Amino acid sequence: MASETEPRPLGTFECQLCALSAPYSYVGQKPPDTQAVVLLEESYIMKDPFSSDKARFLVLGSRCSVCSRLVCVGPDCSLFYSKRVCLPCVQENMSAFPQEIQQDVEKRKSTSKKHSNRP
């Protein structure tokens, strides 16, 4: 049974690429119960279920800055390069990213293919 001081979920975050689904308790850049934390993007946040420390939280995801899809922070769904960008938008705009980001995306694709080929 949840205590009265625990934040109640505002809704359910669902990644539009991988269908990750989790209850979120805050949306914004300044998570509750933190003093010096300001996130670089408006994020969907949940309290860390593995910690009793109220200041600990998990970032679930945010909106893609290009297409506004709701995407998780997982490496197969999005990357953060000054703003959150979903991987389909990264692919469409690959030349707009620095060489290091392009190489990272290529590595992610090859790693993802290796995992999907396993029985």
Swiss-Prot record:
Residues spanning the membrane: none
InterPro entries with a match to the protein in the record: CDPF1, CDPF1_dom
Coiled-coil ranges per UniProt: none
Pfam families: C6_DPF
Record-stated family: Belongs to the CDPF1 family.
UniProt-recorded name of the protein: Cysteine-rich DPF motif domain-containing protein 1
